[in-house]
Amino acid sequence: MIVTRFAPSPTGYLHIGGLRTALFNWLWARKNGGKFILRIEDTDLARNSEEATKAILEAFDWVGLDYDGDVAYQSKRFDIYKRYIQKLLDEGKAYYCYMSKEELDRLREEQMKRGERPRYDRRYRDFTGTPPQGVQPVVRIKAPLEGDIVFEDGIKGIVTIKAEELDDFIIARSDGTPTYNFVVAIDDALMGVTDVIRGDDHLYNTPKQIIVYEALGLPIPRFYHVPMILNEQGKKLSKRDGAMDVMEYKKMGYLPEALLNFLVRLGWSHGDQEIFSLQEMKELFDPKDINKSASAYNLSKLQWLNAHYIKNTPNEKLVKLLEEFGLFLSDHDKKEILLDALKERAKTLQELADMAKEILEAPKNYDEKGVKKALKGEWKAILELFLQKLKASDAHLPSDFHAIIEAVVEEKEIGFGKIGQPLRLALLGKMAGPDLSDVMAIIGKEETIARVEKLIKEKGNS
């Protein structure tokens, strides 16, 4: 059975690179009818944040990635790690190192002066003397002294690290807390993880973890190291580029379906297909197909995908989603016309809510450029004729309002723009927006009259 995991540290927000890693792991487990584990790597007690843990769980809930069993917390597993550290000490595969931080710093300075790579010199590896007084030792694992550590990466191919590049790394700090590479290997083995899909910034942690697996005789999982997401200039993604808390995307009005679709395409593809439902991703995804090179974050692509998903979201669902953006339409009798008119134009839910408010709320002022462009010639007479015909009608459907505009165009023998521009300015306060007939049907006959009369009153003598 395929078992994957996502193991964030709760020291900061979950950003989109992390969510992409989680998605890849989730897809591979679900495709194969396997298990997907969520593990919180909270051994760094000083830097952990309860808020960050909460935000990770909230993000998973929002995008709809479910996990199997309870969330695993490393901080609750210290007894397990201590047992395995003791096992390595008892078997002579690990040892206490009494070198102080000051001694280590001095050693590194001397090595750098000699042009050597700074590293621990293994002086306590086979130590049998009397330990120095007053030093709390760390525990180091005995790494191989020669040969190569070789593993096959599902994306990068065969990876070889020379043993001489690694020192006897610390597996327990002087306060007894275990270190990252040790606990990751223990947890992955004990949780039955078969496939580790993670960012390639972890590539050089892998040989250390393999040393732990081999020292304890534990099974080694398959590894897939995913290239980073870069900005459009090929540099590391910053917050300004989009490397922000996943929940910020929700606040900006992105749909989870769009974000997941966007992320799966950052580094993975299936022919020329761009739109993928979660079910399609599950059926088609294979980590072996992930690109070897880094992918570029493209905001316009995310907006294009989000617009697609908004357009295809049922109005009933949109009404509920838009409440988070201060737009309450459940009791509005023209909500269907409103949403149908706007969801073709919106890139985010925030945009959709803002556009709806621009229609539902009468304009407080008028765009200056629009005034200069639209309010010239006989605009006032044209709008007065429009009002006369509208007041005499019982217009309520878009087609009713459209017919009145057509009648004015015909009677005045003018182009559509001669009425369309001043009318749009009256209704919306600006020159761009959805179909005028839809706008009037949404706000109704009386409100249309009020807005047109207001423009004539304020600008008719200027």
UniProtKB/Swiss-Prot annotation:
It is found in: Cytoplasm. Coiled coil: none annotated. GO terms for cellular component: cytosol. Its EC number is 6.1.1.17. It comes from the Bacteria. Pfam families: Anticodon_2, tRNA-synt_1c. Signal peptide: none annotated. ATP binds at residue 239. PROSITE patterns: AA_TRNA_LIGASE_I. Monomer. Catalyzes the attachment of glutamate to tRNA(Glu) in a two-step reaction: glutamate is first activated by ATP to form Glu-AMP and then transferred to the acceptor end of tRNA(Glu). Belongs to the class-I aminoacyl-tRNA synthetase family. Glutamate--tRNA ligase type 1 subfamily. This is Glutamate--tRNA ligase 2.
